[in-house]
Amino acid sequence: VVIYDKNDKILNTGNGFFVTEDGVALSDYSLFKGAERAVIINSEGKQMPVDAVLGANDMYDVIKFRVAITEKKVPALTVATVAPAVGAEAYLLPYSTQKDRTCTQGKVKKVTKIEDNYSYYTLDMRLKDKMVSCPVADANGQVFGLAQKASGQDTASICYAAGAAFAMSQGISALSLGDITLRNIGIKKGLPDTEEQALVYLYVASSQVSQEEYVSLLDDFVKQFPNSPDGYLRRASTFVFGGKEDADFDKAAADMERALKVAKKKDDVYYNISKQIYNYQLGKPEKTYKDWTYEKALDYVHSALAIDSLPVYVQLEGDILFAKQDYPAALACYGKVNRSNLASPATFFNAAKTMEMMDADPKEIVIMMDSCIARCPQPVAVADAPYVLERAQMNMNAEQYRAAMLDYDTYFNAVSGQVNDVFYYYREQAAIKARQYQRALDDIAKAIELNPKELTYRAEQAVVNLRVGRYEEALKALDEALAVDPKYAEAYRIMGICQIQMKKQEEACASFAKAKELGDTNVDELIKKHCK
């Protein structure tokens, strides 16, 4: 085995051996540590690349890997199913390009049980330097171990062998991406043996590896599980998501077709294809690929619904209809979902937003939103807080100002007070309309504290003070606004209104004139009314 580093320089050389005719081989883990790629050279001098690591154990220094074999099959050794007893003959098979290779003979001195009833051997046998990881066989020619060096004074008379059956038991699990032993090797890792574990592995990999590596894993999955629609659908999704040219979408379309062909549960595949085309259209492509329209997505979800009317399919139908701006039909779909076991805060929220698009009665929209929030765990947690914020705005639209203010309070508590100036401004708007003037003043002061350069807040502060007859405070707020921007026309208009209330007609008219000069169009009526 020849190991190369990141710079494609030889890092290590060592031994290994095939244990299956389709190219699975064993060697020592320490040989592969730091490898970026590896090749094997057989006894005939033929080179073949190592395709994937299939499992490793650093404690017992073993690795299992797959070679991309260049022939239909390769000569392989049979792994012994029964561990040899103490005193049994042991034969070490060296690597040799010569026909007259000689085995090193010895005996099993000690058998130690390791993980899950596997064995680790001490052998009465001297090991030469270049024999590490050569196979150790029993009298029947079956391999029971991988040769390992002894250390110190023992090297002259004994060596060790890690159990070949133990090395064969190494594998990739759904959580192997986080395994530091495997991460120390740059060569691609194989997939877990079962489809279920392999799918979890893909899910974890999708957020941890590069796009290129992920597509390579999907290719492996499709090869390993050719009758699973999941591999084709995930690969299609990757082509759609990263697609820039028709060639990418051609590949995606071909994978969608293959998924349909191999699927036993066709409705699930129709649903997946519909969702992919829907998401593709949501991304607003400059030029639509073939017939990948919302209409086509709708056709596919209808095909799924014809087989099984699952609520999740109805939900997608509603989403597509919403995107097509067919709001009454979308609302009908969301209504069905809300009467099913899929009903959730999100599904009621979808219905409420659809009603908004239909200009429904604001109070009816709030009732729908009440159903959304009633399904959230109470007290409302940070994850569901955005729903409360939405209902606050809906309550404002329905002129239910006190309810809106209470929603803002609930939101504030849900997010532990982690809010910005805009929040305080919105809650102030609810408070002033609910005639909670002191709360309005407190909130607008807080908004100004968080964002002192926002002139709207200072104008609002003046308006609230004006509303409660605090004219001096109103003028002070306006002076502060003009200190930030002397050309802020609205400040002069509000100043004029304030001065009218204070019976300062002349000053008021001067303020109105200044507002008009600075381009305020709302001041004309006031000039007509108060300034002859």
Which positions does each model-derived feature cover?
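Canonical tetratricopeptide repeat
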Residues: 234, 272, 316, 350, ...
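Catalytic histidine site
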Residues: 2-36, 149
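Flexible, gly/ser-rich surface segments that form the specificity/activation loops bordering the active-site cleft
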Residues: 73-120, 127-131, 147-159, 170
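C-terminal cap/linker of serine protease catalytic domains
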Residues: 74, 146-217
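Conserved active-site neighborhood of the chymotrypsin/trypsin-like protease fold
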Residues: 20-93, 98-102, 117-118
